[in-house]
Amino acid sequence: MVPVRGQITAFRCSQNPTKTIWRTLATAEPPKPKRKRTMFTDKLNQGPSFADFVSGKASNMTIDPLEAARQDPDQRLPSWLKVPIPKGKSFHTLKKDVRELKLATVCEEAKCPNIGECWGGKKSEATATIMLMGDTCTRGCRFCSVKTSRKPAPPDPMEPENTAEAISRWGLGYVVLTTVDRDDLVDGGAHHLAETVRKIKEKAPQILVEVLGGDFRGDLDMASVLARSGLDVYAHNIETVEDLTPHVRDRRATYRQSLSILQRAKETKPSLVTKTSMMLGFGETDEQIMQTLRDLREIKCDVVTFGQYMRPTKRHMKVVEYVTPEKFDYWRDTALKMGFLYVASGPLVRSSYKAGEAFIENVIRKRNHNVGETPRLESASAAQL
């Protein structure tokens, strides 16, 4: 018989078999393991006590630090960052086209504030940024609102063909292709992107194609694969200054690695326009920005854009500073003096902001010039934006 806890059980004495010993088993349960502290517990401990409620001091106290950040005047948007709600016939037509053609755009996924402006004009002048290889990234940068996963769904092998067919029927003059980081793929998705570019050029050679790619985990050969695909603009964003990179970007993305990708693209095809983008407002200094511009010119990067970092959700990095339009104008002028061919700089500028409008005329002029001559591009200022 197996003794049961809490029952009175009889045992035979080993020294005297005729003697019976009655013993009650312990009824106390073994101690349960302590529960781990939770974030909710921490928030309660940081918040008002019972004495605060009794004294009436709790009315002005906030338990959630995120709520405190929301109420912080420094986190409120200044007037120059407020944009009207997207509307108009052209905007809704393009949005409908995106749904019917089953295209995923970073304009919508990343909550771009310029979607109404970029999609609001004529279709031939519109710029759309198409997201390839899914909407889930293998990295988790602290500024980005795109979904993350260690193992996203595999890329659709028919995506290059389907995307090219949809874009060729869409009627755009300029298209930007971008992608989430796919560290789960051996080549980082480089061949998938290159095949998409080739398919687009086969079906609609008049369309100018910009690719905003990742760093392929530093695999420079993959940067060469993409550079040779037939694209017109090779873009890779450096995002921020070197000192802040570990705090802003995923640990697998480094400042020097991004520079090497842009450099390899230019070395692979010197006539290729290379482009990068920086966000301001993370707490960077003027000297740090200047050093970044020097580094970019050293690798012969052609185009740079500056925009304001805007916190997508309360789970992301807080904005340290809202940079004024005048300061964006200063960086535009500074970059042009340093030799950049084109600079877009303004609070609402994003890496693909009106890319077609800025580049179509320039690419035509470059192709009409003699080999070795590089025409200077006009710049987009904060005032124009």
Swiss-Prot record:
[4Fe-4S] cluster 1 binds at C107, C112, C118, S352. The keyword Electron transport does not apply. GO terms for molecular function: 4 iron, 4 sulfur cluster binding; lipoate synthase activity; metal ion binding. [4Fe-4S] cluster 2 binds at C137, C141, C144. Pathway: Protein modification; protein lipoylation via endogenous pathway; protein N(6)-(lipoyl)lysine from octanoyl-[acyl-carrier-protein]: step 2/2. Keywords: 4Fe-4S, Iron, Iron-sulfur, Metal-binding, Mitochondrion, S-adenosyl-L-methionine, Transferase. Disulfide bonds: none annotated. Binds 2 [4Fe-4S] clusters per subunit. One cluster is coordinated with 3 cysteines and an exchangeable S-adenosyl-L-methionine. Its main location: mitochondrion. It catalyses: [[Fe-S] cluster scaffold protein carrying a second [4Fe-4S](2+) cluster] + N(6)-octanoyl-L-lysyl-[protein] + 2 oxidized [2Fe-2S]-[ferredoxin] + 2 S-adenosyl-L-methionine + 4 H(+) = [[Fe-S] cluster scaffold protein] + N(6)-[(R)-dihydrolipoyl]-L-lysyl-[protein] + 4 Fe(3+) + 2 hydrogen sulfide + 2 5'-deoxyadenosine + 2 L-methionine + 2 reduced [2Fe-2S]-[ferredoxin]. Pfam families: LIAS_N, Radical_SAM. The keyword Acyltransferase does not apply. Its cofactor is [4Fe-4S] cluster. This protein may be expected to contain an N-terminal transit peptide but none has been predicted. This is Lipoyl synthase, mitochondrial. It comes from Meyerozyma guilliermondii (strain ATCC 6260 / CBS 566 / DSM 6381 / JCM 1539 / NBRC 10279 / NRRL Y-324) (Yeast). The lineage of its organism: Eukaryota, Fungi, Dikarya, Ascomycota, Saccharomycotina.
